[in-house]
Amino acid sequence: MIARALAGEPDLTKRFAGSSIVIAWSNPVGDERPGVVYPPNITPDPDTGIGNWTDDQIQNAVRAGIGRHGNRRISVMPWQGYAQLTDDDVEAIAAYLRSIEPISHRVPREVKPGRRASEPFVYFGVYRQRD
């Protein structure tokens, strides 16, 4: 079942607007050197962002997690939650991304677990399932 929030019917009385698609987690208390994934530059910068991507490539990344060259994007991209977006919605996302200011920023490569990150990163928190 698709999350109501992603189907255009958010339940504003619930956390995350009723969506079951939330951020990935890590445990900085238990993992001294967790793997680190840096988010991509999705501004329309032609050299370091998505400025040279076609609308179809942007839409395919959102809906299927497929990058510009046909490769699967990072595993934390929750594309499964966006797969059922309407054509109008995914076209609006692509149009919005094209409308923002381009920022030249080369993103660091991901860091494998156990290795030291050479760039700063943020822990979003420690999450535990409630019994």
Protein language model annotation of sequence segments:
Residues W53:
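Residue-level signal for the nucleotide or nucleotide-sugar donor/cofactor binding architecture
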Residues N60-R68:
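Glycine-rich, acidic and aromatic/proline-enriched surface loops and short helix-turn segments
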Residues P44-I50, W79-G81:
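Second-shell loop/turn segments in exported
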